[in-house]
Regions:
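Core transmembrane alpha-helical segments of multi-pass membrane transporters/permeases
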Residues: 72-80, 84-89, 98-132, 147, ...
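Interfacial loop-to-helix junctions that mark the boundaries of transmembrane helices
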Residues: 36-38, 62-76, 104-109, 141-145, ...
Length: 469
């Protein structure tokens, strides 16, 4: 299936989407698919975005030493400038025709679905709040012996991030607990915090309500449960390896008991969301179940008044506004880049460098990884890579669920280790609030899960391969 974009370009006939381009057609290893050289200049908007967002971000962070300076760059403005550059290209198309292209890109069913899920997921997190997730964390730490505290931190981070669907939220919640565990023992703070960051990326990769999962599945047109099943068998070996490594490093040491209160009733919404997602219930139904159960619990236990509950839902959904706007702007920009021949040029280069199905899978992973290094946002990286990956799936014979799995996994690998990513910066900030000064490079030495996830992914690509039905 050539996908949405190919159909839309046909719909716009007789508009000329390419001007004086030298196309070359030849057979590819994946089975006789034509290959176009495209127009590399059409990729200029992406370059402009990278200069504005990555360049200025690094300058603010490391040149001007502004705390979390990388995230002081308004990503929406950076994309607006990039879209302006795209609109100035290809004079054979009028501005109205370019607006039509952008409108059709934004109006894609997958984009609309993704936006609605973002808002529902935000409302869910707003309803249940941090106290519910904290109950999950302290409950698991309570039932497992304290001497396994660091290993428990990893398990808790995996579970909470899978239930919450956010790595940053998990790190914000658990980093103070990690510092407390380190203070109650002779474990290094960097080890405890690095373990939490790794576990948080596990759930970010697998959760049904994670924006990365939503973006990857909707962008590639696959069911979330299918992506989860394939992704799980890549993530599980890495998680087990991380757990074994952490146990080997910490066994034999005793820690003081961590006595914090928790409320079992507050765990129910997260459990419902997790179970509903695993069994394959429609994601909207799952989120509505979580929102409804969370609302009933909050009202029944007098933790929120009805007005406060509505305000919390609105605040949670509002937290997704920037992510939603970025998805809209990326869809518009990618529509123009595709029409101008930019994606054909990028695909031409990838086909030249990577051969066969396995090479295509690696190329897809490196593509989204490069996007993530540039944007420091794995959701944005996936949204940007989606249309290119869709073409690669057809060319290299990669199934939609495999493509979604690769995009999500590799984006989480890169996002979990870059020193200027939100996850790392939030962890450092949380440590500082607890009175502990630590650098990103201290933590990077203990990020066992992302490193092992890379190994597991490469084994899945080159040794095991994709099972075809």
């Amino acid at each position: 299936m050539r996908g949405f974009w190919a159909n839309r370009l046909i719909d716009l006939h007789p508009i000329r989407c390419y001007n004086n381009l030298d196309f070359e057609r030849k057979k590819t290893e994946s089975g006789g698919i034509s290959m176009k050289k495209g127009n590399p200049i059409a990729l200029l908007p992406i370059g402009v975005f990278l200069v504005l967002y990555l360049g200025l971000g690094l300058w603010f962070e490391y040149g001007l030493h502004i705390p979390m300076g990388f995230y002081n760059i308004p990503i929406v403005i950076a994309f607006l400038v990039a879209i302006l550059v795209a609109c100035l290209q290809n004079r054979s198309l009028s501005f109205d025709e370019k607006l039509e292209l952008m409108g059709q890109g934004v109006g894609d069913k997958n984009i609309i679905t993704m936006l609605l899920i973002f808002l529902c997921a935000g409302a869910f997190v707003g309803v249940v709040g941090r106290s519910s997730a904290q109950s999950v964390a302290y409950f698991m730490l309570h039932i497992i012996p304290p001497k396994f505290a660091v290993a428990v931190l990893f398990i808790v981070a995996c579970f909470v991030s899978t239930a919450m669907g956010t790595s940053v939220g998990t790190i914000t919640l658990l980093t103070p607990i990690a510092v407390e565990v380190a203070n109650a023992s002779d474990f290094a703070v960097a080890l405890c915090v690095g373990t939490v960051v790794g576990g948080a990326m596990f759930g970010d990769n697998l959760s049904f309500i994670s924006d990365t999962t939503i973006a990857a599945c909707n962008g590639q047109g696959c069911a979330m449960k299918d992506k989860f099943r394939g992704n799980f068998f890549i993530a599980l070996p890495a998680a087990l390896g991380t757990l074994a490594l952490v146990l080997a490093l910490t066994m034999g040491r005793d820690t003081a008991p961590i006595d914090q209160s928790y409320n079992l009733i507050q765990i129910i919404p997260y459990v419902l969301v997790l179970i509903g997602g695993i069994v394959g219930i429609n994601v909207f139904v799952v989120l509505l179940m979580g929102i409804a159960s969370g609302a009933v619990i909050m009202l029944a236990t007098n933790q929120m008044a009805a007005t406060d509950l509505l305000s919390a839902m609105g605040s949670g959904a509002g937290g997704m506004f920037e992510t939603s706007m970025v998805a809209i702007l990326v869809a518009a920009m990618c529509a123009l880049i595709r029409a101008h021949g930019g994606f054909d040029a990028l695909l031409y280069l990838i086909r030249k460098l990577f051969k066969g199905n396995r090479g295509g899978q690696l190329g897809m992973g490196l593509l989204v990884g490069t996007m993530d290094i540039a944007t420091a946002n794995n959701t944005v990286a996936i949204v940007m890579a989606n249309p290119i990956a869709k073409e690669m799936s057809a060319d290299y014979g990669i199934s939609p669920k495999r493509a979604a799995c690769l995009l999500d996994t590799f984006s989480c690998i890169f996002q979990g280790v870059i020193p200027y990513g939100a996850q790392m910066l939030v962890a450092i900030t949380a440590c500082a609030e607890m009175g502990v000064q630590i650098s990103a490079f201290d933590i990077m030495g203990y990020l066992y899960y992302p490193y092992l996830l890379l190994v597991s992914s490469l084994v899945a690509i080159f040794v095991i391969g994709e099972k075809k039905k």
